[in-house]
Amino acid sequence: MLILLSCAKTIGIPKRLPSHLTTTSPIFDEQTTKIALAASSCDIKELSRLLRINRKLAEENHRRWQHFFEDDSPTAPAALAYTGMVFKKLAPANFNADDWLYASEHLLITSFLYGLLRPSDMIRPYRMEGFAHLGAPVEDEVFNFWRPYLTDFLIEKVREKGGELCFLASEEMKMLFDWKRVEQAVRVVTPLFKVPQPDGGLKQIVIYTKMARGLMTAHLLTRRCRHVEEMQLFSPEGFIFRPELSDESNYLFVME
């Protein structure tokens, strides 16, 4: 089984890294360089428009892009650099050496700048969006740019791990791939986390979903789970698997 997570918008470079956590280089260096070149050619106003962010964030990320290619630009393994709720609950800094190695072989993280990342891949601080339409040398929307590179790569990696993909990423990340091809080539199972409402319905609450995704990922990795069915036995943040509300492609967990 392979697990797919989304990147986080927030990044922080730790001052110290646990010595037992080995590091690797990102896979799609050539493509990343093209996106970084396109982004670094943008001024603050252009970044604000392309990324749909306020001026303060645009100024911060303009500085990041201007220093992106410098050798002393800070870096950290992707799983430790991303600071969103998913990664807080994943808590990769607590992994032992064997957990870390296993995670680097069974977890991929989507990224609008780096394409697909292993947890151990060293990254720099950045902000990018899939909907951004970049100039030269990309000349395309980021989603479209990545699709030809990532689709076959993901299918191959899932097949190497037994042909099962646990999709714990956000829906928009499917646009980085030809998702119909992915679903035809491998088995995709999406865990859904919902909360009961006063009217009797069920609703997905973003913060709870992110927490559950991080905990579920940590569980699957540290327990060395090989098949998607094994996640049914785990109850992250009080979410209980409901087989009567699930099907072969969607596993529904409801908060008790």
Curated annotation (Swiss-Prot):
* GO term, biological process aspect, one: response to hydroperoxide
Looking at the UniProt entry, the stretches that span the membrane are none
Protein name as annotated: UPF0246 protein PG_1544
Coiled coil ranges: none
Q: Which InterPro entries match?
A: YaaA
Please report a single Pfam family linked to this protein.
H2O2_YaaD
GO cellular component terms, A-Z:
cytosol
Q: Which domain of life is it from?
A: Bacteria
Family assignment?
A: Belongs to the UPF0246 family.
